[in-house]
């Protein structure tokens, strides 16, 4: 039986920190499904389809990686549906862990067969968050060291589109 995990997140945008956690997960699991959460309460820069395209382009050469969208519903139910035995979460700081720990307990209650695996990214990514990447890029800063080249191109294109629509 293959060891399958899901790696959920908003991924707006997908950063090198996310990629690092995914790479670490692939050292543990045979299959990892990156699951893009679609949350109507969260204002995102990229649409869910743009994030799907972005991540698919990045992981195309990673055997054992698939990408999907969770439009609605509980993550624990989705994990059960795809027969994943683990939920991978990247944890950069204690603050991240407190929230993720609560969620892991809830997911375990809803789907007792699932385990949450907390992975710390490489230290060079501990301060990299999608929200920071968006803000730095919007203010004209260089984020090329923190995102894949395809993400950088999509960021520049999206920011140009937003600039045109706001003028």
From Swiss-Prot:
Gene Ontology CC: cytoplasm
Alphabetic keyword roster: ATP-binding, Coenzyme A biosynthesis, Cytoplasm, Magnesium, Nucleotide-binding, Nucleotidyltransferase, Transferase
Subcellular location: Cytoplasm
Pathway in which the depicted protein is active: Cofactor biosynthesis; coenzyme A biosynthesis; CoA from (R)-pantothenate: step 4/5
BP GO terms, sorted: coenzyme A biosynthetic process
Known catalytic reactions: (R)-4'-phosphopantetheine + ATP + H(+) = 3'-dephospho-CoA + diphosphate
Keyword Cytoplasm appears in the UniProt entry: yes
Database matches in Pfam families: CTP_transf_like
Molecular function GO labels: ATP binding; pantetheine-phosphate adenylyltransferase activity
Superkingdom, natural source: Bacteria
Site (Transition state stabilizer): 18
InterPro entries in the cross-refs: Cyt_trans-like, PPAT, Rossmann-like_a/b/a_fold
Cofactor section: Mg(2+)
Principal place of residence: cytoplasm
Sequence similarity: Belongs to the bacterial CoaD family.
Protein's job: Reversibly transfers an adenylyl group from ATP to 4'-phosphopantetheine, yielding dephospho-CoA (dPCoA) and pyrophosphate.
Assembly: Homohexamer.
Name assigned to this protein: Phosphopantetheine adenylyltransferase
Organism from which the protein derives: Chlorobium phaeobacteroides (strain DSM 266 / SMG 266 / 2430)
Name of the gene this protein is made from: coaD
């Amino acid at each position: 039986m293959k060891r399958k995990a899901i790696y959920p997140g908003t991924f707006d945008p997908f950063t090198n920190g996310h990629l690092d956690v995914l790479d670490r997960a692939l050292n543990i699991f045979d299959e990892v499904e990156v699951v893009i959460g679609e949350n109507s309460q969260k204002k995102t820069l990229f649409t869910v389809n743009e994030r799907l395209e972005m991540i698919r382009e990045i992981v195309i050469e990673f055997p054992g990686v698939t990408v999907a969208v969770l439009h609605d519903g509980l993550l624990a139910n989705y994990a059960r549906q795809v027969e994943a035995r683990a939920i991978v979460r990247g944890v950069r700081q204690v603050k991240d862990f407190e929230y993720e720990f609560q969620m892991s307990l809830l997911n375990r209650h809803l789907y007792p067969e699932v385990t949450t695996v907390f992975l710390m990214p490489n230290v060079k990514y501990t301060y990299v968050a999608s929200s920071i990447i968006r803000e730095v890029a919007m203010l004209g800063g260089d984020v090329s060291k923190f995102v894949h080249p395809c993400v950088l191109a999509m960021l520049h294109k999206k920011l140009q589109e937003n600039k045109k629509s706001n003028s």
